Regions:
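Acidic/hydrophobic-patterned starts of short beta strands in beta-sheet-rich repeat architectures
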Residues: 97-107, 147-151
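Acidic, divalent-cation-chelating loop motifs in proteins
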Residues: 90-98
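Intrinsically disordered, low-complexity linker/terminal regions across diverse proteins
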Residues: 474, 479-796
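Sec-dependent N-terminal signal peptides of Gram-positive bacterial secreted proteins and lipoproteins
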Residues: 4-28
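Noncatalytic, helix-rich "gating/capping" subdomain that lines the substrate-entry/channel surface
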Residues: 201-501, 537
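Short aromatic loop motif centered on NTY/YTY
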Residues: 126-152, 157, 164
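Sec-dependent signal peptide cleavage junction
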Residues: 19-39, 43
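Structural motif
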Residues: 111-117
């Protein structure tokens, strides 16, 4: 029996079909220097032969508490087969459709190849070759040979051994870490960058240690926590706090009365029929604008409404109906009356949901429009009065869905008054049930859940609310955190690293041969205007607008906080944006307790947030080289994103200047073309990399992040020139430690589509681009870590 064989990379001149077994717990070791066998010339066909003795029958895979799955057994066996030996390759591909890959091990032999094919046998937990297992091998991608093996996969390091820094720098530097076990299941991953976050523990201490931590901001958080968990008082209040809002809405008998109700935040804390969000116009970031989104209190999200069938939508709305019915019947309505109100509310809500969706006009937005122009476009709906009630009487508005406001305006008539009233009352009820008494809060809980279990749930939820930067107490929480935990010395040191990075990059820009004088001037203008926001602003935002009156009910406290936040944010509409201003009140994603360090093009600001900092990424005890390798690498990486094809769309003031006709923004076209020519080399390099067996990396997808990694090291090498005695070994080893991680095979293979290269490539493929690395470790052409100068891929 002869079978046709096709390969993606190179033709198979000679193959020998081999039989053998490998075991997850066998005790035999592969010979690292396999002797070559005589070549059996079968051209491009695969034939059955007797097993060859140089391919071991079993491969030993360490066994521990972690249970390897079939795919991992195949992968780790392939690692053993090819090891760090040249001319050995392996691949995995599911040929028979059983969702378990077959393992192909190929060895160069003379002018041809010898190949062993193993299949997994679940009865033995072994990979066993059957002679007729291979029917068609299409587009196989072979790993191994001169490429590094992905040693982040659990078990790979132990099998490969420590190859030395000249052969696999990532594996060698991190060998002890990688050879240990840090994950417990096949869905796990362990990354010290992700494990660094101490923020939650710090915030818990801040809340709970009342004698140690005191002040205005922390008191706001504790007042909210105490009232939220005072169940005696909440039970005594019952649903009385919400009844005044329901009764007020029930007495609306005309559109003119509805106008007044909607404009008064004291009477109407919930329903405006749109959600105002403070933001910036990407084409003119000089002032804050207001974005009008769809109503945030809808019973179902627009994307679900537009992509689900009627039964699914009905099921999703069940919770809304249960909660609304519970509150409204306790307020004195009958179930029949509530059912009618819900039905009427859906008439209005469905019409608005239909309009809350992109159309051709939203694909080509007109940009921000002056407030008075938008208000004038409404013939019926009192948009101007509602906005004035929120403190908005100047500036510009951005409409997300072009059809939404016209539909709302068209429906706002006396004829539909009952629908509007029903919508308001049912939505008030639904938005309130969690902030009243125990009976209301449990209305959506299972019948067997005890009161104590629900109270514990509320306690946990309250902690989440008061410890989150995006919650209604976010500003007070961030102020308290920065007051107690941001170290001024750390801020000073990290600011110095940012300044060193910017200074070095400026020097590189001036020296770049591919940049024209015009391009250099534009790049330097943007870099010089870039503001670095490190750990905390010099002045905290006043949180007085969040002050709590503890004599109020918990419900009233929640309602007042909700309105105070809304009015505080909306009041910024039309205000000039101050370059470098750190508005964590308006943009919670830049709150310092967020786990991030990144460049924001619309603000032309670089943020190093405290949530990203830990003893692993930064401490004052680190040598400067280690600081530069860890936080410096990240800062340099992110900074250069401001000058990549996405970053060049935004000018020095954060305005988007790129157009369809001029996608290169502020960069001269010739410079952009030169940049992309260099980028194509980066892309081509990663196209050749086989990250995991049978799945090659995508250079087109990963070149941007890879280029930023390389640029970060380029900047560090520039900085090193000004530091006599710079310890390059410390720098490169520290950078390898930064990216060390451990993955299950299935978890790692899932990252093949990520825009970032695998972590072992972020070390090996990046370090190998630099003369300083070659010289530090005495690399030559015989070492895997050596890349000839003419093949190196740097942009900056």
């Amino acid at each position: 029996m002869k079978k046709s064989v096709k390969r993606m990379i190179g033709g198979i001149c000679a193959l020998s079909m081999l039989t053998g077994t490998l075991s997850a717990c066998g005790k035999s070791n592969a010979d690292p220097d396999m002797p070559e066998e005589p070549v059996v010339d079968v051209s491009t066909e695969l034939q059955e032969t007797e097993p060859q003795k140089d391919f071991p029958e079993t491969y030993e895979i360490p066994v521990g508490s972690y249970a390897y799955d079939p795919e991992e057994i195949m992968f780790l066996s392939g690692v053993t087969a090819c090891g760090m030996q040249k001319d050995m390759f392996f691949s995995m591909k599911d040929l028979d459709g059983d969702m378990i890959s077959e393992l192909f091990v190929m060895k160069k032999s003379g002018d041809g190849d010898e190949i062993a094919v193993y299949s997994y046998d679940n009865t033995q937990n072994k990979a066993v070759l059957t002679k007729d297992a291979v029917y068609d091998i299409n587009e196989l991608v072979w790993a191994g040979g001169d490429q590094w093996i992905d040693s982040t996969v659990l078990g790979a390091a132990g099998i490969l051994g420590n190859p030395g820094v000249k052969e696999d720098f990532y594996l060698s530097v991190n060998y002890d870490f990688l050879a240990d076990t840090h994950i417990n299941t096949q869905g796990d991953e362990f990354n010290e960058l992700d494990m660094k976050n101490m923020i939650e523990e710090q915030k818990l201490s801040m809340i709970n240690e009342r004698d140690k931590y005191q002040g205005k901001d922390i008191q706001i958080l504790r007042d909210y926590q105490d009232v939220a968990n005072d169940w005696d008082r909440r039970s005594a209040d019952g649903i009385e706090p919400v009844k005044k809002y329901l009764e007020d809405a029930a007495n609306i008998n005309s559109i003119s009365e509805l106008d007044k109700f909607l404009a008064d935040t004291g009477r109407n804390p919930f329903c405006r029929f749109f959600n105002p969000v403070i933001t910036l116009d990407e084409e003119d970031t000089s002032e804050w604008i207001l974005e009008l989104d769809e109503d945030a209190t809808f019973s179902v999200l627009p994307r679900i409404f537009h992509n689900s069938d009627t039964e699914d939508i009905k099921e999703i709305r069940a919770d809304y109906e249960i909660a609304a019915t519970h509150i409204l019947t306790r307020a004195g309505l009958t179930e029949e009356e509530v059912a009618k109100m819900i039905e009427e509310s859906y008439v209005l809500e469905d019409a608005l949901l239909e309009a809350a969706w992109p159309n051709e006009e939203s694909d080509n937005p007109v940009g921000a429009i002056p407030v008075d122009e938008v208000c004038a476009s409404c013939s019926n709906f009192p948009l101007e009065a509602v906005l004035n009630g929120l403190g908005v009487n100047k500036g510009k508005l951005n409409i997300i869905y072009p059809d939404y406001l016209p539909v709302l305006d068209e429906m706002y008539t006396e004829e539909n008054l009952s629908c509007f009233r029903s919508y308001i009352m049912t939505h008030i009820a639904y938005m309130s049930y969690e902030y009243l008494d125990l009976e209301a809060g449990k209305c959506l809980m299972s019948a067997d859940e005890t009161d104590e279990e629900y109270k514990e749930y509320v306690k946990d939820r309250t902690y989440t609310e008061i410890m989150g930067s995006r919650g209604i107490l976010g500003v007070a929480e961030e102020n308290a955190y920065m007051t107690y935990y941001v170290d001024p010395k750390a801020k000073e040191t990290l600011t110095m690293i940012c300044e060193d990075t910017a200074e070095a990059f400026a020097a590189m820009i001036k020296e770049e041969e591919w940049l024209s004088e015009e391009g250099k001037a534009a790049a330097l203008e943007k870099l010089n205007k870039m503001k670095f926001c490190v750990l905390s602003p010099d002045e905290l935002i006043d949180s007085s607008y969040l002050a709590i009156d503890t004599s109020d009910s918990f419900y009233d406290i929640y309602v007042k906080l909700r309105v105070s936040n809304l009015k505080h944010n909306c009041a910024a509409t039309g205000e000039k944006r101050v370059p470098g201003e750190w508005r964590y009140d308006l943009r919670p994603e830049i709150a310092t307790s967020v786990d991030n360090a990144y460049y924001n093009g619309s603000l032309n600001q670089f943020f190093v947030l405290a949530g990203f900092i830990s003893d692993f990424t930064f401490s004052d005890d680190m040598p400067y080289e280690e600081m530069l390798a860890k936080m410096g690498s990240i800062i340099g990486h992110e900074l250069t994103h401001g000058f990549d094809p996405n970053g060049i769309q935004y000018d020095a003031d954060g305005n988007k200047v790129a157009t369809d006709d001029k996608p290169y923004g502020w960069m001269p076209e010739a410079d952009y073309n030169a940049y992309m020519e260099k980028a194509e080399k980066v892309s081509a390099y990663f196209d050749k990399v086989v990250g995991v067996p049978y799945m090659a990396c995508s250079g087109e997808q990963q070149w941007g992040e890879a280029s930023a990694d390389i640029a970060g090291v380029s900047i560090a090498m520039k900085i090193a020139q000004d530091h006599p005695g710079f310890d390059y070994d410390c720098y490169f080893r520290s950078r390898a430690e930064l990216w060390r991680e451990q993955m299950s095979f299935i978890r790692e293979s899932g990252y093949i589509t990520d825009a970032h290269p695998f972590n072992y490539l972020r070390v090996n493929a990046v370090n190998a681009q630099f003369d300083e690395f070659v010289q530090t470790y005495g690399l030559s052409e015989d070492n895997r870590m050596y890349i000839p100068p003419e093949e190196r891929i740097t942009i900056w």
